[in-house]
């Protein structure tokens, strides 16, 4: 049978393939040796024309489907095969979707730009409106200020409205009362202020009273303007009279207070400049009933008294004497307290109180705290607990006497090491190839479990053969050599008896009689009778 030759096939695509998009019809030279089934041809077409993309491929010849498992011999030379690829439709759908998405994004961008433009135009309109309103407000304010500066036209009162007349009468009464209250402190004689107040305080009080008078007069003027037309020129003589009264009070204050007293007052004022002065205090100082007394040092007060003793006024001298007595009493109390504090600091053995409250009662501990490094623990109170440390003092003389009286005895203790047992040399003994007779002594080694539960070869042990089974090679042996007692390990169980003794149950028992296999013995050697007797 001749070998299959290559076949020329025409391929017809519904859409141009992605690898060669120039056409939909192609010639393909099919090698029948490489293909056995129709599926192989489909894979070749996918690799060449679809760039290995997914999607189902169906092949038709004369509108008849070629089954994927059919032999490749179905296809003849110059057959036209229609290729139907499902991936082309999927690609076209994806392209359409991307186009739609791009159009939507463009429309969104356009809408966004439009909204931004609208917002900008809205902001511009708002700014224009706000600027116009600001201009209107400024113009309104300017007009209001000009209107306030202009004298208000007189209001015409109608006699037919009795309620308006009553209100205007009430306002006039209120204005008169405020005038009387403001003028009351000025009517007081200037001597009282000059005797007991410093010039700065009086100046401040006068300024406050002047402000209140002006404010009250303004309010009264505005209220009266609503009732009757009053010209503004009438306030000038009143203000000039008030200024003359103020100047007179200032001159009287400056004449009455000496320069030395003023210097003393200024020094004390610098020390106590932080003390706030309220408006109510200033009103009471100016009122006349309450007076301000300024502390002055005694030297300045003596000069002040000498100067004022020459003046003919007796009232001023009496008031100055009272002030001096009070200031001297306060100064004496201050000096007594300072001297007492200094004496307390200088005297360390004073049994006085500390900073505690109350007096020293017999049933209470002394309160307060003493200075650091001074005083005893008795000066501390019992409120927080006495933190006194107790130290025991030992009499060294008694200890020395006891050491001298004691009898010294020399005792010598000899410490001897235990005699070392000479280890036996088992290497010179003859090795055993088979089990010896019953009753013989042998030396052997065993594979045992150590304290760490690891297998180790033990040292030579001596044992006496009690019985031997030649079939099973089991030896019953009595171990003669002394066995070293090992400590119980983690797998050993320790019991406690009624007497309190510990009973150890070893995982690997240590018994004198043992059943062993002859093959388990390592290097068994025969012990001579002489050596066994010497050992006994």
From Swiss-Prot:
Sequence repeats: 353-358, 380-385
Low complexity bias (residue ranges): 213-238, 371-380
Biased composition range(s): Basic residues: 171-180
Cell location: Nucleus
Keyword Ribosomal protein attached: no
Swiss-Prot/TrEMBL domain comment: The atypical Tudor domain at the C-terminus contains two large unstructured loops, and doesn't bind methylated residues.
Protein name in UniProt: Coilin
């Amino acid at each position: 049978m001749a070998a299959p030759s290559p076949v020329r096939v025409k391929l017809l695509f519904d859409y141009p393939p992605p690898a060669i998009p120039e056409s939909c019809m192609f010639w393909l030279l099919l090698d029948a040796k490489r293909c056995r089934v129709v599926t192989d041809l489909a894979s070749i077409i996918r690799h060449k024309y679809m760039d290995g993309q997914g999607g189902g491929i169906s092949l038709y010849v004369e509108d008849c489907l070629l089954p994927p498992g059919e032999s490749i011999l179905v296809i003849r030379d110059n057959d036209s095969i229609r290729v139907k690829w499902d991936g082309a439709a999927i690609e076209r759908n994806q392209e359409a979707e991307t186009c739609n998405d791009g159009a939507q994004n463009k429309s969104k961008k356009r809408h966004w730009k439009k909204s931004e433009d609208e917002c900008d135009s809205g902001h511009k309109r708002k700014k224009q409106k706000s600027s116009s309103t600001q201009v209107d407000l400024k113009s309104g304010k300017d007009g209001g200020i000009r209107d306030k500066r202009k004298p208000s036209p007189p209001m015409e009162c109608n006699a037919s409205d009795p309620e308006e007349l009553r209100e205007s009468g009430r306002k006039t009464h209120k204005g008169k009362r405020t005038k009387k209250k403001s003028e009351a402190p000025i009517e007081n004689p200037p001597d009282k202020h000059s005797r007991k107040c410093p010039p700065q305080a009086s100046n401040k009080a006068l300024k406050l009273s002047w402000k209140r008078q002006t404010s009250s007069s303004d309010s009264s003027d505005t209220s009266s303007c609503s009732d009757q037309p009053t010209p503004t020129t009438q306030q000038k003589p009143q203000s000039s009279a008030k200024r003359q009264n103020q100047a007179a009070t200032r001159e009287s204050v400056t004449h009455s207070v000496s320069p030395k007293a003023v210097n003393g007052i200024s020094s004390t004022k610098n020390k106590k400049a932080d003390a706030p002065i309220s408006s109510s205090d200033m009103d009471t100082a100016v009122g006349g009933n309450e007076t301000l007394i300024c502390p002055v040092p005694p030297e300045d007060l003596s000069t002040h008294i000498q100067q004022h003793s020459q003046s003919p006024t007796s009232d001023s001298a009496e008031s100055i004497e009272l002030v001096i007595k009070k200031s001297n009493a306060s100064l004496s109390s201050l000096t007594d307290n300072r001297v007492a504090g200094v004496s307390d600091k200088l005297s360390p053995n004073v049994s006085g109180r500390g900073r505690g409250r109350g007096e020293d009662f017999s049933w209470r501990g002394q309160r307060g705290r003493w200075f650091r490094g001074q005083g005893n623990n008795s000066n501390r109170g019992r409120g927080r607990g006495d933190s006194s440390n107790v130290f025991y003092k030992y009499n060294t003389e008694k200890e020395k006497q006891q050491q001298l009286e004691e009898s010294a005895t020399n005792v010598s203790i000899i410490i001897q090491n235990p005699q070392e047992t000479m280890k036996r040399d088992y290497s010179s003994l003859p090795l055993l190839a088979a089990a010896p007779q019953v009753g013989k002594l042998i030396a052997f080694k065993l594979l045992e479990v150590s304290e760490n539960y690891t297998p180790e070869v033990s040292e030579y042990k001596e044992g006496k053969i009690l019985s031997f089974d030649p079939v099973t090679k089991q030896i019953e042996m009595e171990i003669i050599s002394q066995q070293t007692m090992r400590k119980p390990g983690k797998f050993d169980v320790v019991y406690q008896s009624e007497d309190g003794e510990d009973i150890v149950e070893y995982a690997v028992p240590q018994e004198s009689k043992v059943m062993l296999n002859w093959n388990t013995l390592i290097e068994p050697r025969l012990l001579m009778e002489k050596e066994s007797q010497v050992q006994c």
